[in-house]
C-alpha cells in the first residue's frame, strides 16, 4: 500500500491557532477543547495546569479504507494526525493507535508515550481495502476497559477519524470515555453515516472541515 497523501504537521495551525501553542497558563489541550465543542473565543480553550500533569492517554482509530481516498479525505486526516502526534510528543502524552483498513484493524501503538516513529508511519499511510471500523471500535472498547481497570486515575480520550461508509452495523455501546468523531466524508454526495455513528457512540461530532475553520 502506498501513501496517497503527505502528512503536514502544521496543517491545523492556521485553523486552531493558539490551540497548538503554549501560553503562560500552560499548554492548550486541543483534543479536550474540541470535545466540548468548537472554541469561538479564547476562554473556550482548555489548558493543562503547569503544576499538575495527570496521566493522559489518547486512543486514536484511523479509517484508511479505499473510500477515504475521495476528495482528499485521507490527506486532511493525515494533517490532523500529524498535529495530534506532534502535540502528544511535546506533552509526553501516551497514545494508542488503531489502523482500520483491509480485513481487520491493526494496533500500531498501545499505550506508549508518543514517538517520532508515528510520524514515519503516517508518511507512509495510504488508503485501500475494506472498512474494518467496527472491528476497530470493538477492539478499542475492550482495550480501554482493561486499561481503565489497570490505570483508574488516567485521563483517557477516544478519537475516531472515519467517513462512516459502512453498509450497516449492529447497535453499539457508548464509548467508555470522552470521545470525538471526526467525519472525513467529503464531496457533493454525503451519506451522513458518520454523524449517526457518533450519536450511537455518545461522541462529539465534527466534520474535518471544521477543524480548519476554528
Model-derived features with residue positions:
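C-terminal "exit" segments of structured domains
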Residues: 212-214
Amino acid at each position: 500500500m502506498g501513501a496517497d497523501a503527505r502528512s503536514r504537521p502544521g496543517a491545523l495551525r492556521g485553523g486552531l491557532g493558539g490551540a497548538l501553542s503554549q501560553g503562560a497558563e500552560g499548554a492548550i489541550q486541543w483534543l479536550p477543547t474540541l470535545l466540548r465543542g468548537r472554541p469561538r473565543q479564547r476562554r473556550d480553550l482548555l489548558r493543562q495546569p503547569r503544576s499538575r500533569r495527570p496521566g493522559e492517554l489518547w486512543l486514536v482509530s484511523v479509517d484508511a479504507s479505499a473510500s477515504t481516498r475521495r476528495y482528499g479525505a485521507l490527506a486532511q486526516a493525515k494533517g490532523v494526525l500529524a498535529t495530534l502526534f506532534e502535540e502528544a510528543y511535546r506533552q509526553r502524552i501516551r497514545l494508542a493507535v488503531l489502523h482500520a483498513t483491509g480485513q481487520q484493524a491493526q494496533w500500531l501503538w498501545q499505550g506508549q508515550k508518543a514517538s517520532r516513529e508515528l510520524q514515519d508511519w503516517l508518511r507512509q499511510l495510504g488508503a485501500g481495502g475494506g472498512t474494518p471500523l467496527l472491528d476497530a471500535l470493538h477492539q478499542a472498547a475492550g482495550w480501554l476497559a482493561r486499561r481503565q481497570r489497570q490505570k483508574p486515575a488516567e485521563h483517557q480520550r477516544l478519537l475516531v477519524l472515519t467517513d462512516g461508509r459502512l453498509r450497516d452495523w449492529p447497535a453499539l455501546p457508548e464509548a467508555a470515555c470522552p470521545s470525538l468523531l471526526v467525519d472525513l466524508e467529503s464531496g457533493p454526495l454525503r451519506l451522513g453515516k458518520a454523524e449517526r455513528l457518533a450519536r450511537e457512540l455518545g461522541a462529539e461530532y465534527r466534520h474535518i472541515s471544521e477543524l480548519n475553520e476554528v
